[in-house]
């Protein structure tokens, strides 16, 4: 499998955002956000943070690490209590380096009041905006595109009568994927880009005492909030003492194209995204996969965790018995969202163990959600061979990843994708399976069972709803600023 090593570098991000407002002040905000971030931990494992609003004063804590590592009992006890509003964030970096300065929420202080900002997504015009802001005097402390949004918000707040108008004006400036939660001294605001690339939903607290915004509905469940609806693409939603209200000036300005990978991999199975339960969508993907790529076999198993639902769907459609083929070490993070390639390879070695009783001497259908680099796939198939599987037929509930993502998913460079420049048969040989079948793009586009939204499928097709950036933020970090008179000393 030595050929695979050249396709095992790259890939980056996903984030989770959360905000909660309780006009009565009876909700324990520290406990609520802590619980919500646990529910969203699968969306980012590099850093996390909580910001609280106590009597109009914003403060918080953020650091590198998992929620359980950053928010120890001591830290939780030292956070201010009595807040009526709070925000939280989990991060895995796509735009910006892995550092504490890039952790969120970002708390901003300016002459019209403080605000805390949480962002999920990627801006395609962040390099251009950052350079413009630096030329106007802005000093950046981190390397993420969220800081670009922060500076634009503070500038626009000086030019507008209220924060929601500043958010609207900022949305005029930024392009790409963004689901935002913003907290001021009196308001909690959610905003979503006009394409709706990343999910964002609204929940109501018990007894109608307030509202919550979250990347996924599972976080609403964690705090006992009732799911109301998704934030519409382009919508700004404001929660304050008057209730809930909406601004829709950016709604309908672009086609709705949520990232299809939310259904395939990122979102938790119990979450409802755009009206469709993620578990149900993955079951349907497995059924479609069985229709497209049937095979004679003895057992169907899934690659934990996001391949399990599709495997069950494949078994239901094909009539082949479903089995549990692997035991997963729950204390090793997901390989797809860990920082370096060496970390990923080490975690693959200790992450899974095949159950010999399920696969020995059998023809196995292994269902997985994707093949990105190929490292994990090859190792997983090798585990099945070592456990005695007679045949391994690999089935993928997504089309081949052959193109980078610019909107907040961990796929940055075509050179790092095994599907780039290789046929399906070549990939089959590289990962070591007997046969390989991918789900078609036509069936992928039917996974939003209970909604009429479209999908961004750029990582499969190379066709994007928004033009890709001409340069990345990584280039901007190292590029010196140009000035009109280079010889003049500043």
Describe the function of each predicted region.
Residues 1-233, 238-297, 303, 391, ...:
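Conserved short alpha-helical segments that host acidic/polar catalytic motifs at enzyme active sites
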Residues 94-95, 125, 189, 197-198, ...:
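Flexible loop/turn segments at secondary-structure boundaries
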Residues 118, 183, 191-192, 203, ...:
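Generic beta-strand/beta-sheet core signal
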Residues 138, 159-160, 294-298, 316-323, ...:
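Secondary-structure transition/capping motifs at alpha-helix termini
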Residues 142, 147-150, 322-333, 430-448:
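A conserved beta-strand->alpha-helix junction
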Residues 169, 218-219, 226, 234-235, ...:
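Phosphate/diphosphate-binding loops
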Residues 171, 186, 224-230, 251, ...:
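PRPP-dependent phosphoribosyltransferase catalytic core
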Residues 319-364, 375, 402-408, 412:
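Short, glycine/charge-rich flexible loops or terminal/linker lids adjacent to PRPP-binding catalytic cores
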